Amino acid sequence: MKHIVKQIHFVGIGGAGMSGIAEVLVNLGYEVSGSDLSRNAVTDRLEALGARIAIGHDAANIAGANAVVVSTAVRSDNPEVLAARHQGVPIVQRAVMLAELMRLKQGIAIAGTHGKTTTTSLVASVLAAGGLDPTFVIGGRLISAGANARLGTGDFIVAEADESDASFLNLYPVIEVITNIDADHMDTYGHDFARLKQAFIEFTQRLPFYGSAVVCVDDPNVRQIIPFISKPVVRYGLSPDAQVRAEDIDARDGRMHFTVIREGRAPLAVVLNLPGLHNVQNALAAIAIATDLGVSDDAIQQALAEFNGVGRRFQRYGEVPSADGGQYTLIDDYGHHPVEMAATVAAARGAFPGRRLVLAFQPHRYTRTRDCFDDFVNVLSTVDALVLTEVYAAGEAAIATANGDALSRALRAVGKVDPVFVASVDDVPDALAGVARNGDVVITMGAGSIGGVPAKIVQNTQQKE
């Protein structure tokens, strides 16, 4: 590709999905430019690596580009997209560019409605511990690497495969993981769940005859598609028929202790430096792949025990002073679908037994809030105290029956929790100050702007000291 394409421009380069690909291309020696609406730590990092960053979208930003990379979040009337079309510069979807990177190495693609980022990070970490030095492109910041992407010298590239816009069908990896299949982003599939499941079947058809589909048999929807997968299947999970399964699971001190049972191998005692049964399942996917690729058991054990996590995935910010003179534990999480949220709440209960759980939640997208309204009410009713914000629109038009006020009224009608509603996410720190008590576990949660709240809370605390 390099002898034809020398300069590549990214529209929305600061996004999690775009920035990782951009970083790998910079490290491969391409000239990379990009634009975004505001600066952040990601754009600063890319600029330090040599990328040319512009703040704001303007036709002049694509000067000299041989290709313009966009995601489905970029509107067709974006001035840079219009300029590229006018100048005859190829407009490339993000997933297509990721597919080009996979052509350079052997691809390991992690798919599923929930758990992609953590599973991708675990796979990359375990393979790195085994000396395979993989390239990785992750939708979140791998804390141990300080980045969401890295160019390795090994044969493999590990990346997330996004089903939200069906773009994962552009990828042709040699190993695929399917963590689960749930009803999300249903507008892509005409609100037809059968079409969503069919897309995952088609995803497995991208595998070569020597490839493998590593699938979680604990998920009933994944189990249903297994008979339609024509390539070799490796089953993992907690179920008795899993070829790589966990037994003797014990949650202690925020870690998961369990024994891995693999066909033809001795049992392996593992300590995972993450809480929650869902993370045991994510780790099993990494163990299955690592075992297949010849990573030693010692390396697997070390990588999982030392795993530092991913930014915004049950990320601990430590102890914060509470208004009553004590301290509470502050955690941030990206969960925005009721299934993910329930898993995180369960993980928090297991990691901090007997402690009061306070949640500050920002719903993400009006359509998701509408489609999963009852499920949101159910999972939010399981916490001890709740601060609720208005929905983060993500470009959608407001829906009066699926906004923060409607959710608050529904929660009060159930009567298990009385939410403190704030119209703006900027008001969350003050609202939490009035709710959190000594010994509480406080989780900020959502896929929108609430991700900046924990740092503000910590900053406010430091200014008062």
From Swiss-Prot:
GO terms for cellular component: cytoplasm. The keyword Manganese does not apply. Coiled coil: none annotated. ATP binds at G112, T113, H114, G115, K116, T117, T118. Pathway: Cell wall biogenesis; peptidoglycan biosynthesis. It catalyses: UDP-N-acetyl-alpha-D-muramate + L-alanine + ATP = UDP-N-acetyl-alpha-D-muramoyl-L-alanine + ADP + phosphate + H(+). It is an enzyme of class 6 (ligase). Disulfide bonds: none annotated. Keywords: ATP-binding, Cell cycle, Cell division, Cell shape, Cell wall biogenesis/degradation, Cytoplasm, Ligase, Nucleotide-binding, Peptidoglycan synthesis. InterPro entries: Mur-like_cat_sf (IPR036565), Mur_ligase_C (IPR004101), Mur_ligase_C_dom_sf (IPR036615), Mur_ligase_cen (IPR013221), Mur_ligase_N (IPR000713), MurCDEF_pg_biosynth (IPR050061), UDP-N-AcMur_Ala_ligase_MurC (IPR005758). GO terms for molecular function: ATP binding; UDP-N-acetylmuramate-L-alanine ligase activity. PANTHER family: UDP-N-ACETYLMURAMATE--L-ALANINE LIGASE (PTHR43445:SF3), UDP-N-ACETYLMURAMATE--L-ALANINE LIGASE-RELATED (PTHR43445). Belongs to the MurCDEF family. This is UDP-N-acetylmuramate--L-alanine ligase. The lineage of its organism: Bacteria, Pseudomonadati, Pseudomonadota, Betaproteobacteria, Burkholderiales.
